[in-house]
Amino acid sequence: QMDMENYRLYPDPAATKLVKALAAEYGVSDKQVFVGVGSDDVIAMSFLTFFNSDKPVLFPDVSYSFYDVWADLFKIPYERPMLDENFNIKPEDYMRTNGGIVFPNPNAPTGVYLELDNVRKILDANRDVIVIVDEAYIDFGGKSALTLLDEYDNLLVVRTYSKSRSMAGLRIGYAIGG
C-alpha cells in the first residue's frame, strides 16, 4: 500500500527495501545485491566496473545486441566467439586470455540454454575475471547460475523484472554476486 504523501519524495537511491527483499528471496546478503534502472543499466554499470583491461571481453556472436553497444560506448575491446551449428555456446571458446565474459542464459535471441556444467567450465577457466551470466529469460527454462554463487566469487548473475514478470515499465534490474 502506497501513501500518497510519498509521491512527492524522490525514491531511495540505494533501493534499500528492494535490495533487502531480493536478498531475502535469494538467501544472500544484501551486500551481494545491486539494483539498477533495468538490467541494461546493471549491465552497463558492470561493464564500467569490471571490464577495464586491455584484454577483450568475450560474448557470443549471436546474442543480446546491447553487449557490443556498451563495449563500443565505453571503448572496451571485445571478441565474439561463434556459436556452434546448433546455436550453442562452446565453453572451450571462452578458455583463453580475456578481460571478462558476459553471456545470456538462455541465450537471446536463440533461446538455447547453456547447462550449468558448461557454465561451471567457463567459470573454472576464468577465475581471474568477472563472468556475467545475464538471466533475463531464465524463468522460461533452465536452472539459474545463482546456485553457483557460493563456489565462484567471479560470478555475477544479472536479472530483470521485464520479461517473465511483464513489469518492463518498472525498470527493475538487479545483479547478485559474491
Feature locations, PLM:
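Active-site phosphate-binding strand-loop segment of PLP-dependent enzymes
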Residues: E79, D84-D139
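PLP-dependent aminotransferase-like
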Residues: T16, T49-P104
